[in-house]
């Protein structure tokens, strides 16, 4: 038993928080294969029962970043990866928004995986749309540079995550690893729109982003529990702008968007979700388009491309209506 896991389990058994340095060391021990399955399970369960702190989340992310593959990216790159876990069954809103954001001129390094909740993850829907999940780091760099968007498949860039796959599966509960995807972008995207599935995660993830040196980001959760900027009502959000953390509320009707029901936003299989995304990019109007505009507009505000969400929505609408968003998809398909 390493010193770090012994000390960590001792503290967690007393429901005490782990110091950042100790957390970083114990994750390194985990990644180097020095922990037993029982120790890994105890660590993850102990953190979950106690409640993870922003410092613990950031330390996990720092250790995993060090173990993952990286790519070079333009300075203004953004990611729309969220935590998932809202179990709402909606279509792939943030993935669809990624094409719109890229069409508006902000490079998007979309980090994602196969489904973790619901029926369709970002990798599943992009595969249906004809985008290769096997792009090398070199080709992803080229896509970002010349097309303005790439998909970074978590399984390719973070193979170390496989070391805890069995323990996570056997525990059968959400753990700190369910929070880490948005913090592990291989392109080091300095701008983010990060959806979370619970209001309690808002301040935690915002603080973790700040610790990790995020340049500017919006963390959001819909009052309906959606891990997106929702269209069914208000969204609680936090803007992280360097050293500043500022809570605010997003109300769709203030931007001329009609409220809808969750049923209006339902997705289905990867094939069905792919068709929804394609129809939106081809110009179909309605609530599905509107929630994509709202999320893309918020992301453009987070990336400093727009002075506010209203201007961001206008830029997003222009990206769709001009065909630029659809063109991003077509170029990525052609490069597969």
Swiss-Prot record:
- Where does this protein hold Mg(2+) 1? 94, 228
Quaternary structure (record): Homodimer.
Coiled-coil positions are none
Species whose genome carries this gene: Desulfitobacterium hafniense (strain Y51)
What keywords appear on the UniProt entry?
A: Amino-acid biosynthesis, Aromatic amino acid biosynthesis, Glycosyltransferase, Magnesium, Metal-binding, Transferase, Tryptophan biosynthesis
Q: Quick one: which residues bind 5-phospho-alpha-D-ribose 1-diphosphate? A: 82, 85-86, 90, 92-95, 110-118, 122
What lineage does UniProt assign to this protein's organism? Answer: Bacteria, Bacillati, Bacillota, Clostridia, Eubacteriales
Positions bound to Mg(2+) 2? 227-228
User: Could you tell me which pathway this protein works in?
Assistant: Amino-acid biosynthesis; L-tryptophan biosynthesis; L-tryptophan from chorismate: step 2/5
Q: Name one GO cellular component term.
A: cytosol
Q: Which reaction is catalysed here? A: N-(5-phospho-beta-D-ribosyl)anthranilate + diphosphate = 5-phospho-alpha-D-ribose 1-diphosphate + anthranilate
Swiss-Prot/TrEMBL GO biological process terms: L-tryptophan biosynthetic process
Q: Which residues bind anthranilate 2?
A: 168
Cofactors needed by this protein, per the record, are: Mg(2+)
- Describe the function of this protein: Catalyzes the transfer of the phosphoribosyl group of 5-phosphorylribose-1-pyrophosphate (PRPP) to anthranilate to yield N-(5'-phosphoribosyl)-anthranilate (PRA).
The record ties this protein, via SUPFAM superfamilies, to:
Nucleoside phosphorylase/phosphoribosyltransferase catalytic domain (SSF52418), Nucleoside phosphorylase/phosphoribosyltransferase N-terminal domain (SSF47648)
Q: What is this protein called?
A: Anthranilate phosphoribosyltransferase
Enzyme Commission number(s) from the entry: 2.4.2.18
| Membrane-crossing segments per the record | none
Under the heading Pfam families, the entry gives: Glycos_trans_3N, Glycos_transf_3
């Amino acid at each position: 038993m390493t010193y770090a896991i012994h000390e960590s389990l001792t503290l967690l058994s007393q429901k005490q928080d782990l110091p950042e340095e100790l957390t970083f060391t114990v994750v390194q021990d985990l990644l180097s294969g020095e922990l037993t399955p029982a120790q890994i399970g105890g660590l993850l369960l102990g953190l979950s029962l106690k409640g993870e702190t922003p410092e613990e989340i950031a330390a996990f992310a720092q250790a995993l970043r060090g173990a993952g593959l990286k790519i070079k990216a333009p300075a203004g790159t953004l990611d729309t990866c969220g935590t998932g876990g809202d179990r709402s069954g909606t279509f792939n809103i943030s993935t669809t928004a990624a094409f719109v954001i890229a069409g508006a001129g902000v490079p998007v390094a979309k980090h994602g995986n196969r489904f973790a909740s619901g029926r369709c993850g970002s990798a599943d829907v992009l595969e249906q749309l004809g985008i290769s999940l096997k792009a090398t780091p070199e080709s992803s760099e080229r896509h970002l540079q010349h097309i303005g968007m790439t998909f970074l498949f978590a399984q390719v860039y973070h193979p170390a995550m496989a070391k805890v796959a069995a323990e996570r599966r056997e525990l059968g509960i959400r753990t700190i690893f369910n929070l880490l995807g948005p913090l592990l972008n291989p392109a080091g995207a300095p701008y983010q729109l990060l959806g979370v599935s619970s209001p309690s995660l808002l301040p935690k993830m915002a603080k973790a982003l700040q610790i990790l040196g995020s340049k500017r980001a919006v963390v959001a959760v819909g009052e309906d529990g959606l891990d997106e900027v929702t269209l069914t009502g208000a969204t609680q959000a936090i803007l992280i702008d360097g050293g500043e953390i500022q809570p605010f509320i997003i109300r769709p009707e203030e931007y001329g968007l009609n409220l809808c029901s969750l049923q209006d936003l339902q997705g289905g299989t990867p094939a069905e979700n792919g068709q929804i995304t394609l129809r939106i990019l081809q110009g179909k109007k309605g609530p599905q388009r509107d929630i994509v505009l709202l999320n893309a507009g918020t992301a453009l505000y987070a990336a400093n491309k727009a002075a506010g969400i209203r201007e961001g929505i206008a830029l997003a609408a222009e990206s769709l209506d001009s065909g630029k968003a659809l063109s991003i998809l077509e170029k990525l398909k052609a490069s597969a």
